[in-house]
Amino acid sequence: MNNIRKNHPLMKIMNNSFIDLPAPSNISSWWNFGSLLGACLALQIITGLFLAMHYTADTTTAFSSVAHICRDVNYGWIIRYLHANGASMFFLCLFIHIGRGLYYGSFTLTETWNMGIILLFTVMATAFMGYVLPWGQMSFWGATVITNLLSAIPYIGTNLVEWIWGGFSVDKATLTRFFAFHFILPFIITALVLVHLLFLHETGSNNPLGTSSDSDKIPFHPYYTIKDLLGLLLLVLLAMMLVLFSPDLLGDPDNYTPANPLSTPPHIKPEWYFLFAYAILRSIPNKLGGVLALISSILILAIIPTLHMAKQRSMLFRPLSQCLFWTLTADLFVLTWIGGQPVEYPFITIGQVASILYFTLILILMPMVSLIENKMLKW
């Protein structure tokens, strides 16, 4: 019998990726977040498309066009809040996805891991540009402060910033180009996701034990399709609780004030998912040093496969490494909290200590403890 699912050129690709894909039999719920990220991306593209139909990328009308979407467009309010809180869901899943990769040693699949880092940077750039579009106070000043960081680059910095702005300050040209980039980037992200999956399917998934799964595999469908569906339902529940009960919980009240270049808000801060990096940036008094620390805080992920000293791939049976992993998690929570606080004592000191601890844990303590564990296990 000619099975269309297995023989049709397009269906065959879908079949080998999502239906007959051999998957490890023991992957836990921490492996759900890849599919949840795919769902978040789809949600963002769909809601974003409908928002773009009513939004105007002009400094005089951008703010009122967002208000118009919420007030006059049919279900515009839910589309807008799904898009805004969808970004938070996206980053929540992203951080858990990366955390799982660190804990279970998935970074040893270097091509997939490096592709993931490129994806992280692209998603962060997209989210930043999206935050500028409503043209509220925090949008305008966030754009000014973050783009201004590029002026720390020696020699070409100032020219680079003015080139990005399209003038001598954040203005109409900046908003228009940010909208254009914000629209195109999710489609680039989709293409990168396909490459990410291509690399993953070359090697197959890791599992909680960190061992080879070749001896025991099960088909992706129905086992993991059902499992992913449960994760999706829980994510939808969380998203709907946010959107329908407290849609502005994660936003900034300052963004309900139209952008005013003549009045600076008392505390300029980005969305919650950038606060950890923002805290690291602020903890260094030097501008260039701060920018380097900011970039390093994310780029450090690229050298994690090199820093992996343990003979075991996963942290499942390495209690000392587990302690350091959860210390790192707690440290990131502290940095996120500090990023949202004003620049004054004691927050400055706490931020500096947390920033030093972040780099020390990853660069020194984790590799050292891995070597100690190897010795303890007589490896």
From Swiss-Prot:
Keyword annotations: Electron transport, Heme, Iron, Membrane, Metal-binding, Mitochondrion, Mitochondrion inner membrane, Respiratory chain, Transmembrane, Transmembrane helix, Transport, Ubiquinone
Locations listed in the record: Mitochondrion inner membrane
Cofactor(s) required for function per UniProt: heme b
Pfam assignment, any one: Cytochrome_B
Binding site for heme b b566: H97, H196
Function: Component of the ubiquinol-cytochrome c reductase complex (complex III or cytochrome b-c1 complex) that is part of the mitochondrial respiratory chain. The b-c1 complex mediates electron transfer from ubiquinol to cytochrome c. Contributes to the generation of a proton gradient across the mitochondrial membrane that is then used for ATP synthesis.
Further information: Heme 1 (or BL or b562) is low-potential and absorbs at about 562 nm, and heme 2 (or BH or b566) is high-potential and absorbs at about 566 nm.
Protein name: Cytochrome b
Species annotation: Eulemur flavifrons (Blue-eyed black lemur)
Gene designation: MT-CYB
